[in-house]
Protein backbone atom coordinates (compact mmCIF):
# COMPACT_ATOMS: atom_id res chain seq x y z
CA UNK A 1 0.00 0.00 0.00
CA UNK A 2 2.86 2.35 0.88
CA UNK A 3 4.74 1.61 -2.35
CA UNK A 4 1.57 2.03 -4.43
CA UNK A 5 0.84 5.40 -2.82
CA UNK A 6 4.44 6.51 -3.40
CA UNK A 7 4.66 5.30 -7.02
CA UNK A 8 1.32 6.77 -8.10
CA UNK A 9 1.59 9.87 -5.92
CA UNK A 10 -1.93 9.47 -4.59
CA UNK A 11 -3.01 9.07 -0.97
CA UNK A 12 -4.20 5.72 0.35
CA UNK A 13 -6.16 5.01 3.51
CA UNK A 14 -6.91 1.86 5.48
CA UNK A 15 -10.03 1.28 7.51
CA UNK A 16 -10.01 1.85 11.25
CA UNK A 17 -7.35 -0.30 12.90
CA UNK A 18 -7.23 -1.73 16.41
CA UNK A 19 -4.20 -1.10 18.64
CA UNK A 20 -2.67 -4.42 17.56
CA UNK A 21 -3.28 -3.72 13.86
CA UNK A 22 -1.70 -0.27 14.26
CA UNK A 23 1.42 -1.82 15.81
CA UNK A 24 1.66 -4.31 12.93
CA UNK A 25 1.10 -1.57 10.33
CA UNK A 26 3.80 0.59 11.92
CA UNK A 27 6.25 -2.32 11.84
CA UNK A 28 5.43 -2.95 8.16
CA UNK A 29 5.90 0.76 7.37
CA UNK A 30 9.30 0.72 9.07
CA UNK A 31 10.36 -2.38 7.11
CA UNK A 32 9.23 -0.73 3.86
CA UNK A 33 10.98 2.52 4.90
CA UNK A 34 7.74 4.42 4.43
CA UNK A 35 8.14 7.90 5.92
CA UNK A 36 4.84 9.54 4.99
CA UNK A 37 2.25 7.61 6.99
CA UNK A 38 0.33 8.74 10.03
CA UNK A 39 -2.57 7.47 12.10
CA UNK A 40 -5.76 9.55 12.50
CA UNK A 41 -8.85 8.71 14.48
CA UNK A 42 -10.82 11.95 14.38
CA UNK A 43 -9.71 13.12 17.82
CA UNK A 44 -6.37 13.20 19.70
CA UNK A 45 -7.08 10.33 22.11
CA UNK A 46 -8.55 7.92 19.56
CA UNK A 47 -7.96 4.22 20.13
CA UNK A 48 -9.12 3.01 16.71
CA UNK A 49 -7.33 4.94 13.97
CA UNK A 50 -6.96 5.01 10.18
CA UNK A 51 -3.51 4.69 8.59
CA UNK A 52 -3.17 7.64 6.20
CA UNK A 53 -0.47 7.25 3.54
CA UNK A 54 -0.13 10.65 1.89
CA UNK A 55 3.01 10.98 -0.25
CA UNK A 56 4.66 14.40 -0.51
CA UNK A 57 3.03 16.59 -3.18
CA UNK A 58 -0.23 14.62 -3.08
CA UNK A 59 -3.56 16.04 -2.00
CA UNK A 60 -4.73 15.41 1.51
CA UNK A 61 -8.20 14.58 2.74
CA UNK A 62 -9.59 13.59 6.08
CA UNK A 63 -10.90 10.01 5.87
CA UNK A 64 -12.69 10.31 9.23
CA UNK A 65 -16.10 11.93 9.73
CA UNK A 66 -18.25 12.34 12.84
CA UNK A 67 -21.91 11.44 13.27
CA UNK A 68 -24.00 12.57 16.22
CA UNK A 69 -26.28 9.72 17.28
CA UNK A 70 -29.28 10.95 19.25
CA UNK A 71 -31.48 8.41 21.05
CA UNK A 72 -35.19 9.23 21.16
CA UNK A 73 -35.82 7.51 24.49
CA UNK A 74 -38.91 8.23 26.54
CA UNK A 75 -38.39 9.66 30.00
CA UNK A 76 -37.08 6.95 32.31
CA UNK A 77 -36.15 4.57 29.48
CA UNK A 78 -32.63 3.22 29.18
CA UNK A 79 -30.58 4.94 26.47
CA UNK A 80 -28.44 2.82 24.14
CA UNK A 81 -24.86 2.14 25.18
CA UNK A 82 -21.65 1.48 23.27
CA UNK A 83 -22.53 -2.17 22.64
CA UNK A 84 -26.03 -1.27 21.37
CA UNK A 85 -24.70 1.28 18.87
CA UNK A 86 -21.87 -0.98 17.74
CA UNK A 87 -24.27 -3.87 17.17
CA UNK A 88 -26.79 -1.74 15.30
CA UNK A 89 -24.19 -0.23 12.98
CA UNK A 90 -22.57 -3.59 12.24
CA UNK A 91 -26.04 -5.07 11.63
CA UNK A 92 -26.32 -2.68 8.67
CA UNK A 93 -23.78 -4.94 6.95
CA UNK A 94 -20.73 -2.78 7.59
CA UNK A 95 -17.35 -4.13 8.61
CA UNK A 96 -15.80 -3.15 11.98
CA UNK A 97 -13.06 -1.34 10.03
CA UNK A 98 -15.65 1.27 8.95
CA UNK A 99 -16.23 2.36 12.53
CA UNK A 100 -13.82 4.08 14.90
CA UNK A 101 -14.44 5.19 18.46
CA UNK A 102 -17.90 5.74 19.94
CA UNK A 103 -17.96 8.44 22.62
CA UNK A 104 -20.99 9.11 24.80
CA UNK A 105 -21.63 12.70 25.81
CA UNK A 106 -21.14 12.86 29.61
CA UNK A 107 -23.50 15.87 29.79
CA UNK A 108 -26.24 14.22 27.72
CA UNK A 109 -26.37 10.39 27.84
CA UNK A 110 -28.87 10.34 24.94
CA UNK A 111 -26.11 11.59 22.59
CA UNK A 112 -23.18 9.52 21.32
CA UNK A 113 -20.58 10.60 18.77
CA UNK A 114 -19.46 8.01 16.22
CA UNK A 115 -16.20 8.40 14.29
CA UNK A 116 -16.72 6.68 10.93
CA UNK A 117 -15.09 6.47 7.51
CA UNK A 118 -16.05 9.49 5.41
CA UNK A 119 -17.51 7.36 2.61
CA UNK A 120 -19.88 5.53 5.00
CA UNK A 121 -21.51 8.56 6.65
CA UNK A 122 -24.42 8.91 4.22
CA UNK A 123 -25.22 5.21 4.44
CA UNK A 124 -25.16 5.14 8.25
CA UNK A 125 -27.09 8.42 8.57
CA UNK A 126 -29.88 7.18 6.30
CA UNK A 127 -30.12 3.56 7.51
CA UNK A 128 -29.45 3.66 11.26
CA UNK A 129 -32.91 3.98 12.82
CA UNK A 130 -32.63 2.20 16.16
CA UNK A 131 -30.16 0.93 18.74
CA UNK A 132 -31.02 -1.15 21.76
CA UNK A 133 -34.73 -0.56 22.23
CA UNK A 134 -34.71 3.11 21.18
CA UNK A 135 -35.21 4.99 17.98
CA UNK A 136 -32.04 6.79 16.91
CA UNK A 137 -31.39 9.72 14.62
CA UNK A 138 -27.93 10.05 13.06
CA UNK A 139 -26.78 13.42 11.78
CA UNK A 140 -23.54 14.91 10.52
CA UNK A 141 -21.47 16.78 13.07
CA UNK A 142 -18.74 19.36 12.49
CA UNK A 143 -17.49 19.82 16.04
CA UNK A 144 -17.50 17.49 19.03
CA UNK A 145 -17.77 19.18 22.46
CA UNK A 146 -14.57 19.27 24.51
CA UNK A 147 -16.30 17.50 27.40
CA UNK A 148 -16.73 14.46 25.12
CA UNK A 149 -13.16 14.53 23.82
CA UNK A 150 -11.66 14.26 27.28
CA UNK A 151 -12.31 10.54 26.98
CA UNK A 152 -12.94 8.06 29.76
CA UNK A 153 -11.26 8.45 33.11
CA UNK A 154 -8.49 5.95 33.68
CA UNK A 155 -7.45 4.97 37.16
CA UNK A 156 -4.05 3.82 38.30
CA UNK A 157 -4.16 0.78 40.54
CA UNK A 158 -1.40 -0.66 42.64
CA UNK A 159 -1.28 -4.21 43.90
CA UNK A 160 1.15 -6.58 45.55
CA UNK A 161 1.34 -9.84 43.62
CA UNK A 162 3.19 -13.08 44.37
CA UNK A 163 4.69 -13.15 40.86
CA UNK A 164 4.68 -11.09 37.67
CA UNK A 165 2.72 -13.74 35.78
CA UNK A 166 -0.08 -12.29 33.66
CA UNK A 167 -2.80 -14.26 35.47
CA UNK A 168 -1.53 -13.11 38.85
CA UNK A 169 -1.45 -9.42 37.90
CA UNK A 170 -4.83 -9.62 36.14
CA UNK A 171 -6.41 -11.37 39.14
CA UNK A 172 -5.22 -8.56 41.41
CA UNK A 173 -6.62 -5.90 39.05
CA UNK A 174 -9.96 -7.68 38.59
CA UNK A 175 -10.26 -8.64 42.29
CA UNK A 176 -10.85 -12.26 41.31
CA UNK A 177 -9.10 -15.62 41.41
CA UNK A 178 -6.10 -16.52 39.26
CA UNK A 179 -8.17 -19.30 37.71
CA UNK A 180 -10.79 -16.84 36.39
CA UNK A 181 -8.03 -14.49 35.23
CA UNK A 182 -6.29 -17.36 33.41
CA UNK A 183 -9.62 -18.29 31.76
CA UNK A 184 -9.98 -14.71 30.48
CA UNK A 185 -6.44 -14.84 29.05
CA UNK A 186 -7.02 -18.24 27.39
CA UNK A 187 -10.30 -16.98 25.87
CA UNK A 188 -8.42 -14.10 24.21
CA UNK A 189 -10.24 -11.37 26.14
CA UNK A 190 -6.96 -9.94 27.46
CA UNK A 191 -4.00 -8.59 25.50
CA UNK A 192 -0.55 -7.60 26.69
CA UNK A 193 1.19 -5.17 24.35
CA UNK A 194 -1.35 -6.02 21.63
CA UNK A 195 -0.45 -9.73 21.58
Per-segment meaning from a language model:
Residues 1-168, 172-173:
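Ferredoxin-like alpha/beta domains used as RNA- or RNAP-binding modules
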Amino acid sequence: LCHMADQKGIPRYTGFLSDREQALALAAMNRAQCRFGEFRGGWPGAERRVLCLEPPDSWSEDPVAVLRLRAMAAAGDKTPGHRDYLGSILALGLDRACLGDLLQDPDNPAVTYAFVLQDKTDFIASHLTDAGHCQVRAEFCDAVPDSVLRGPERTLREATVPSLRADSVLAAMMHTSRTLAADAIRAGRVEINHV
